[in-house]
Each structure stands twice: as C-alpha cells, then as structure tokens.
Amino acid sequence: MSLRIILKRDFSQCIRVFESGIKSSTTTTSNRFQAQYGNKNNDNTKRNTNNGNRFHNKYNNESRRSYPKTKYQQQYQQRKQPYIIDPRKIKFNNGTESARNAIEEIINRIYKLQKNYQIQLITNSGLKNYHLSEILQNLDLSINGLQLIDKSTSTTTTTTTTTTNNGGNELPLIKIITVREMINQYSTYLNNLKQLELIKLGSLKTLKTLDIKLKLEQKKSTTKEILIKWSINNNDFKLQKTNEIKKLIGNGNGGKNFLINMVYNKRNINKSIDTIYKYQCKGDEIEEKNLIEIELQRRQLLINNLQSLLTELNCKWIIEGDINTKMTFNVTPSISQSTTTTTTQEQEQEDYNDIEEKKLNRTERKKRKSQQQQQQQQQQQSKTNTTKKDEDEEDLDALYSFKIED
C-alpha cells in the first residue's frame, strides 16, 4: 500500500513537470509574433513608432505643426460682429409722438437709400461710418434728433463722399440736431407731400399759393436793378432816380447789393456813341465829333452826380463797362450809425404805439363790457317791473271782484 501511494505521488509530480515544460516550450517557440511585438521594452516597437510609422508621426495631435491662418479666415474673424438690432424694431421710451413719427420717417428714407443701414455721421472730427442702430440706441429723443442730408443740395463741405466696401455706393449722410429742428423739418416734409397730392388732384388754390411762394423767393434771391438812360435830364435824375435808390436802401435792403445800369435804351443796351449820330450828320464827321464830345461830357456829369449821391448814402461801388456803350455800378450799401439810431428810435416809437393801442383796446373792451352789463341789468329791471305791475293789477282785480260779490 505504501509503495502504491508513493508511486502515485511521483507520477502526478512527473505529469505536472511535463505539462509545465510543454507550456514553456510552446510560448517560446510557437508564438513568435508575441515575442516580437508584445514586449513593451523591445527595440522593434520603438523603431516602428518613432521611425517606421511615418503617418503616425505626421498626423499625431501632439507633434502637429501649427500653420498660419489664411487671409480669408483672418478677414472672416474681423468681419465677425455682435448681433445688430434692426433699427425698425428699436422702441423709444423718451420723446413725443411727433418726434417718434419723424424718426420712423427718417429710418424708412434711409432704408430706401441703403438697405443695410450703413451711414456716415457728421462729427466735429469729420465723417465717420456707423450702423444706424448704434446711433439710435444712444439717442435721447427728448433732447436730440436726426437729420438726413440730401447730397444734391448740401454744400461741398458736407458732401465729401467716400467709397466703402458696399460696392462703392455712397452712404447717406446724417447729422445730430435738436428735436425742435427735426419736428419742424418733418412738418415741412408733410406739407410738401400734401401739396403734391393736391396738385395731382388738380386743386387751383394750391397752384396759386405755390406761384406766390416762388415769386417771393425769386424776389428775395434776385439782385435788384435800377435802369438809367444816358439821355435823362438832371431834374429827372434828382426827382426820380434818387428817390428810387433811397427807397431801395431804406426798405429792408440794408446789406444787399444792387445794380445800377446806365444804358442808351432798353432795347439797345449795348449801343455805342459812334452809331448814334451817323444818321443825323449824314457823313459830316466834324459835326459828329462835336456831338459825341457833348454827349460824353453830359454822361460824365451824370456819372459824377450818381457818385456824389452814393457817397452821401454811405455806399461802396464797383464800376464795370464803358461810357461809350454801357456802365454798371455794383453797389453795396453800408448801414451807418445815423441810420441805425433812426431805425432804433422808430422801432421804439412803434413799440410804444403798439402798447398804447393795446391799452386803448383794453379800455374799450372794458367799456363795452360795462355797457353790456348795464344793458342786461336794465333789461332785468324792466322785466321785474312788468311782472310786479301785472301782479298788482291781478291783486286789484281780485279785490274788486271780492267787493262786488259782497
């Protein structure tokens, strides 16, 4: 029994040793790929990762080289802006309804000119490009407003246009003004629209009013002219033309220029002296020369008289033309101290007269009111008297009838 047990133990140990030997041999001989690539400390792996696997080295995130951005990417980042609000959606808590309506009209007009609402703002330092929403968000309608300037009618200083990236189009000009000015401009704009509608309908009253306005504007804009013939007498000049010149200077034409044209005739303005006396003399040169000399002397006297008159009126002038054909005096009247004192005195007198008239009107009104009150009182008294008389008569009739019954 003991021998059997010993043999069994030895046999089991031998089997274990044999199995362990087989496993070791199989691992060392059969799995050569594991022996080649499985060991982390093997030199072949280092060779494959560092040198052999070029794609791994090229596209590894850690070893990737940072390339510079293209121009398109840089421009795209520069163009990136924060979210811009549509100007039509901006609501104003300040200001009146008329101011809000005026700004809405300006926004609509800007949209017709520039649909992306890019504008040019007139500032003290010059023109600056803005988006309309940037200005509207910082605008206080109770104080300030906006003005859209037409480049066709504006001056050269304000019409300096610059081409931008928006296809080379000219941006609309805007100026910050007071609210009153904006409302006044909006009211004139509405009046013009109404007039155009009435003209389309064919109303005659609007046409007449427009004609009157145009005539007044032409009178204000045009320089006034006085025409003097060379053949005028000294008496006529002193009586007629001096009064015309004085009236023109006195009637509100203080600083404005006016022209004095000295001509032969209205029809023949530039007619020369040489052609005047040819038909009279009939080829006689001596008579013609004598007449021309006399005419020149007379014209010179007329010029001297006019110059002396202008010096009396404290005017400055510039002479253009020639005695032989035509002469024009470009006159600029200067307001003297005497005229200013007289005008101030006249204004004071007019103001005093206006005050007195107002006082008289007040006194007259008071008198009228007092008279009306007296008349009303008299009428009331007369009514009360008539009612009392009627009552007394009724009482007497009642007493009389009572006595008769008794």
Swiss-Prot record:
Region (Disordered): 29-79, 335-406
Compositional bias annotation for Low complexity: 38-54, 69-79, 371-385
Subcellular location: Mitochondrion
Transit peptide segment: 1-18
Gene Ontology cellular component list: mitochondrion
The entry's keywords: Mitochondrion, Transit peptide
Pfam family, one: mIF3
Similarity comment: family membership: Belongs to the AIM23 family.
Protein name: Altered inheritance of mitochondria protein 23, mitochondrial
Species assigned in the record: Candida dubliniensis (strain CD36 / ATCC MYA-646 / CBS 7987 / NCPF 3949 / NRRL Y-17841) (Yeast)
Lineage: Eukaryota, Fungi, Dikarya, Ascomycota, Saccharomycotina
